[in-house]
Amino acid sequence: MRRVTRSQISRRSLLLSPAAALSCSPPKATGFRGYCFVGNQVSRSVAVVDLTKFRVRKQIPLDAAPSAVLPHPKVTKVYVLMPDAGTVAEIDGMSMAVSRRVRAGNQAVAMQMSAGKDALWVLYRDPASLVELPLDSLRPGRRIRLASPPDSFHLTSEGAAGRQAAVASVQHRSLTLVSLTTGATERTISAGAEPSFVIFRKDGRQVLSGSRPERSLNIFDAASGKTVVRLPLPVEPRNFCVSSDGGELFISGPGMDAVVIVFPYSTEIWQTVLAGRAPGVMTLTEAPSYLLVANPETNSLTVLDESQKLVALVQVGEQPSQLILTPDRQYVLVLNEKSGDMAVIRTYSLRVPRLGTMGARFRSAPVFTMIGVGEKPVSAAVVPWV
């Protein structure tokens, strides 16, 4: 063993070392002043999680199983879709109870907030229609009737060329474009392949449709309905997410342990990157720019940086099914369907290396806490206290 001389370790360096360690320590975690409302499918309930204390405040019973939860854009309320009952329920975060409910059909499929954030649009299969629910009244407004049974839909975003909805029908292998201003069907596009999902490009000028049976992404011109390009995919397109500027589309699904990255504006596939075993749902963070990918088969979360390199792995609960970012971007909330809990991950822990891992290619990031929320959580929304 080499002898340590006085010149190598000084009294000054010993005094300064605790200060250096403190300067490198992570900032103290603070809660988010708001609630996370978690829809539980099997237990037919909504769990209200206090994000300042990270515990469930209340379980709100529902009349039917929920499938989606959306936040109100201005106040502490959420909207819960119960598709088999054809009902949308409004839950008030202050009273922690159902404040209003509306039923505009027998069987619903999905719902989305309008670009103006003043109404919900609910897609119904029975009867086949797209129904507007203004938030102020929560009563059925305009009803746009559809010629074929719908399976999914998407609305143009704010700032797009027009206010439209694209509705996909698997049975008829078609995409129907309707005007949200006039309520008229503008055109029906023959998709050729079964449309598994449909989205507008951010400017509203093109419609993108993924087909699981044919493993393809089909891009159509919204104005004419003509096919722009058909892009073959190495996966069945089941999950997707879009960057905030609309310049990147990320697709995952069965067939390959990878995520496909598409450039919608240049209508080309940029690259395919490995993203853990059987990649599922995804979300994006900013500053730093990370792609978070759920891996249900391994009960984990894969984190890729902007150069698509693996930077972290996080072990979460069983079968992670949805990823939600808190509005302050401080936490990632992971819903785990099988284990019935929600993993809370600090985004800071994903970007700051821990001691002893500086030379590692990637690291294992910790879970901040786990919260039991109910049987089969399938959707959630975070709203601040107002």
Short names for language-model regions:
Residues 9, 18-386:
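Predominantly soluble domains enriched in secretory-pathway, periplasmic, or organellar proteins
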